[in-house]
């Protein structure tokens, strides 16, 4: 069956199944309601304005300068992401947002935590990190590769291999510190050679009586 005949037959069956307009009750006003035309115009304008994909902005020297002077290859990507996010036009606010996003990405890629040059930096990459591997020098051969993970695990109390050498020395120095201050505190003073002994515990029978009272 040719295409035109099929559409004619379909329209004929549709007309047969639905009542004709002439059989409907006549409306008091024959003209369409006054709000239908502006609504149709507004919806048509919306459809035409929200058509996808939007035409990309021409990459010029000005647009490159507006996006932090990035190379032209990355500029259309940024414009497309701004237009897909729902903004009607890449105005000053969206371009500012894009520039801030580009700046933060560049700054994070240059940070020592993610750069490949820091061989044995701590994951936190803080100078005050208590981790022994946060020093900024290349790690010795016995701490490269899997041995570095083992050294991290050895810091845990009671690990079979014990703590790494640096942590061992640190713990020994930390243990000697209170002992040295204790010795210093109990050395005899120059004027008083005899340090007073501990006060004797009172006799239980003398409890509640004055100190000079007979037993």
From Swiss-Prot:
Chain spans, region Disordered: 1-144, 156-215
Residue spans of biased composition, Low complexity class: 16-29, 49-58, 85-96, 104-127
Designated name of the protein: Uncharacterized protein F-215
